[in-house]
């Protein structure tokens, strides 16, 4: 399945928010995410993706049909290198996992923003860790290092 990344426009903010809610719900099995009294998982930086030039959000879509398959949220807030990018949030709808959608979307993110990257897999999620380890290893031909469970690499 061929996929594309589509930059999320402010007019599509509600769609991204709904997808993010699903992702945060899914992650809550492994981290400290809690719903508030309105049944919303709060995400303090969400609005910043539409006003801050250091943050970008993309929908992952099937190229042929334009079907929505997931999303990626990227920022430039890195801790182990002087400058670069990081995947803040990343989710592929479960039905489309295990058929290269996530891998291809991640690689497209890396290709859009050449240079230094830090990838922080979800806490306590072996599945997320394995996914990112496989993607980073393949993309970098093994040329990355692991710093306290954070994948760090540079690809120009």
Which residue stretches match the model-derived regions?
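Conserved GNAT-fold acetyl-CoA-binding loop/helix
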Residues: 24-46
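Active-site beta-strand termini and strand-to-loop segments that position acidic
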Residues: 61-63, 153-156
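A short beta-loop-alpha structural element at the N-terminal edge
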Residues: 3-18, 27
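A short helix-loop-beta-strand connector motif used in the catalytic cores of GNAT acetyltransferases and
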Residues: 45-59
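Conserved beta-strand-loop-alpha-helix junction that forms the acyl-donor binding cleft
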Residues: 118-133, 137, 145-150, 154
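Conserved beta-strand in the GNAT
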Residues: 59, 66-76, 86
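Conserved acetyl-CoA binding element of GNAT-fold acetyltransferases
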Residues: 83-94
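Conserved acetyl-CoA-binding loop-helix of GNAT-fold acetyltransferases
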Residues: 92, 98-111
